[in-house]
Each structure stands twice: as structure tokens, then as C-alpha cells.
């Protein structure tokens, strides 16, 4: 398939670190150990976010023990078959992860899990690509994300970098053929749709009921442009579709990703970044609905950095998540902040001051 992907880099603008520093807070529950199951690494002309950058964020006060990298069209191979170019991203991230695992850069282990991209629309032929990604992943390669975010109502909203249709998850026969290979190889699947596409994921999850799936970013409730004046309508339809999706026991959900422009909260337009109280208040209807629908054992908080860094700092974000989980028990917090992610991605258990790895 000729050039099946667009690049994310053209959509990223440099972040304003001076602005982000205007809101600082004491760290809440600093003793709570956290796995961040969703962040990116890249070096685009518009913005750089590599190992030292993520470590600066994870080292800002919360006890982040390990992280999971999600594909973002970074460091693709420059030559070779088009279908195999995303293998370069796995090679790059495995190198960053190996640097982190050396212990030279602190105790947080970056990218103990790697989620890459392969074009599942290749059908059964995608197995060759997946096997090569597993081979170069150093034991860290966990699965695939193939985004199907699609909106034709608001010109400011970009469709997914995989160039999907509105119903790729639901009725693309070649995609389904490739999707079936994930189970054969024991790989996970990250899904990303806007709220209008949640029913297509529900259809996919029902068709492949044994495939572990996690929906990113609370299912993408839109609030930009056309959707800005329809927030109540969006919340109602989103809530209905999230509850229906949660009936699929093979599906989990990531709690976060609400600080992007498409969500329409516009925190990035303010003179000062929001406090964790303000973030928690804005996000509560979405986060609480997800936790109620899926339960703590099928829900995990995520940073989605540096994309969500548009709206606030890493320290403030995790403070907001802790505020949102304030009523949870210790066991429920362990699930939401750590164990659900560890189980889904088959991550190592890390012990001691040097984060010794034990399976």
C-alpha cells in the first residue's frame, strides 16, 4: 500500500515551558507508585520530546516507576518496503528504553512496553511486519495501535494519521483479516476514535471477543468548532456509547487525553495554566463515567504526554488524576494507577530503589 500514513509532526507546535511553569503545586500522594501507560517520544522539526524530556516530566515529583510508549510516526525507516517503515520506530524506542534500563538516568524505566504501528489493512501479510517488530523490540514490544479517529463535521479536527474511513474498525474486511493476526501472536490492540466512532469499536470488540483491546483517551469526546456548542449533546451520546462498549469484557479504557485541542476545554488559551482542581472539575463527568462503566480493573490513568502538555504540566496532571480518584480504596487506586496497565501490557514488576525487574 502506497504511503498509508500521514505524519503527526506537522500537527505539533512547540510547547511554552515558561507558561507551564506558572502553575506549580505540592505533589499529592507522592508515595503512590504509578505506571504511565501512554506517552510518545519524537524529534519533529516543530517539537522534540526524547528520553531526557520524558524523564524531566516523570521526575517532577510523582513516583512514576515505568512507562509505555505509543506509536506516533517517529523515526520511521527512510528506505525499504512502505509496510516495514514503522519498524524503525520500534528500533528507536527500544534504544531509548535500553538507555533508561541502564540506570544511568534515574530509577524510572521508560518504555518497558512499546506499542507500535503496522498497517492491519495488509490483511494476513501484516504478520511478517509484526514478527519483525517483535524481533527488534527487545522483549518490550507489546502490541499495535491503529487509530481510526474520523470526523467530517469540523475542518479544524484532523482525521487519524492512518487515513481511516468512518467505519474502518467495523467493516473493513482487510483490516479484520490483519486484526486477527494480533491474537495469533499474543499482541494487544490500542484503539483511538472520536466519540462518534465508539460504536464501530464496539462492533470490532464483539467480532473479536478474545482480543485484548484498550480504548485511548476516554473515547475522544469532541468539543472544538462545530462541537463546541453541542457539549451536552456530545456528553449524552458519548456516555451511552461508553456504557455499551464497557459490556465487552475484552475492552479496557485509558483515563486521560482530554487536554488536546479537539476536546475544546481551551486551557491553553488562558494566561496561566489550570490547577489540578480545575482540571479535575472539567474532566470529572468523563473520568467518573468511565470508571463506573469499566471498573478499576479495566481502567488506567494516562498522561498522553507531550500532546496533553498543551494544557498543563505533568505534575499538575497527575495531581488532577489523584483528585479524581480520591474516593477510591487503596486497592482500587493500585489498579487505576498501576496494576491495570501492568496486567494489560504484561509489564515487569519493579522492586526496590533501583527498580529491579521481576516478572
Language-model features: locations:
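Catalytic pocket-lining loop regions of alpha/beta-barrel enzymes
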Residues: 4-6, 10-12, 165-300, 311, ...
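Catalytic metal-binding/acid-base residues of hydrolase active sites
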Residues: 40, 73, 119, 147-149, ...
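Mid-to-C-terminal alpha-helical segments outside catalytic/metal-binding sites
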Residues: 1-33, 49-57, 65-66, 285-289, ...
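Short, well-ordered coil/turn segments that N-cap beta-strands
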Residues: 30-33, 62-66, 106-113, 137-142, ...
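Active-site gating/metal-coordination segments in enzymes
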Residues: 3-22, 81-197, 203-206, 219, ...
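Conserved, mostly hydrophobic/aromatic
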Residues: 38, 67, 93, 114, ...
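Alpha-helical scaffold segments that flank or form the walls of functional sites
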Residues: 44-109
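Histidine-centered catalytic micro-motifs
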Residues: 33-44, 215-218
Amino acid at each position: 500500500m502506497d504511503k498509508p500514513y500521514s505524519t503527526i509532526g506537522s500537527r505539533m507546535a512547540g510547547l511554552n515551558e515558561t507558561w507551564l511553569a506558572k502553575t506549580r503545586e505540592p505533589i499529592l500522594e507522592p508515595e503512590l507508585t504509578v505506571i504511565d501507560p501512554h506517552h510518545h517520544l519524537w524529534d519533529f522539526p516543530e517539537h522534540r520530546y526524547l528520553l531526557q524530556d520524558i524523564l524531566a516530566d516523570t521526575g517532577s515529583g510523582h513516583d512514576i516507576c515505568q512507562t509505555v510508549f505509543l506509536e506516533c510516526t517517529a523515526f520511521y525507516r527512510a528506505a525499504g518496503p512502505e509496510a516495514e517503515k514503522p519498524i524503525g520506530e520500534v528500533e528507536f524506542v527500544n534504544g531509548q528504553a535500553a538507555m533508561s534500563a541502564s540506570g544511568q538516568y534515574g530509577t524510572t524505566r521508560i518504555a518497558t512496553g512499546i506499542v507500535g504501528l503496522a498497517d492491519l489493512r495488509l490483511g494476513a501479510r501484516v504478520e511478517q511486519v509484526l514478527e519483525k517488530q517483535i524481533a527488534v523490540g527487545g522483549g518490550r514490544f507489546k502490541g499495535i495501535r491503529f487509530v481510526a479517529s474520523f470526523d467530517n463535521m469540523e475542518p479544524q479536527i484532523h482525521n487519524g494519521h492512518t487515513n481511516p474511513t468512518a467505519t474502518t474498525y467495523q467493516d473493513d474486511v482487510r483490516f479484520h483479516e490483519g486484526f486477527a493476526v494480533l491474537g495469533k501472536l499474543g499482541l494487544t490492540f490500542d484503539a483511538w476514535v472520536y466519540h462518534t466512532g465508539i460504536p464501530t469499536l464496539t462492533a470490532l470488540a464483539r467480532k473479536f471477543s478474545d482480543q485484548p483491546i484498550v480504548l485511548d483517551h476516554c473515547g475522544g469526546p469532541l468539543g472544538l468548532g462545530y462541537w463546541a456548542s453541542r457539549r451536552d449533546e456530545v456528553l449524552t451520546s458519548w456516555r451511552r456509547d461508553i456504557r455499551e462498549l464497557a459490556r465487552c469484557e475484552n475492552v479496557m479504557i485509558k483515563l486521560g487525553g482530554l487536554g488536546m485541542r479537539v476536546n475544546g476545554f481551551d486551557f491553553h488559551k488562558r494566561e496561566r495554566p489550570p490547577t489540578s482542581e480545575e482540571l479535575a472539575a472539567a474532566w470529572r463527568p468523563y473520568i467518573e463515567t468511565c470508571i463506573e462503566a469499566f471498573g478499576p480493573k479495566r481502567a488506567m490513568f494516562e498522561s498522553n504526554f507531550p500532546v496533553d502538555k498543551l494544557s498543563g504540566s505533568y505534575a499538575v496532571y497527575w495531581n488532577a488524576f489523584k483528585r479524581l480518584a480520591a474516593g477510591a480504596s487503596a486497592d482500587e487506586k493500585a489498579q487505576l494507577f498501576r496494576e491495570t496497565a501492568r496486567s494489560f501490557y504484561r509489564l515487569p514488576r519493579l522492586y526496590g530503589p533501583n527498580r529491579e525487574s521481576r516478572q
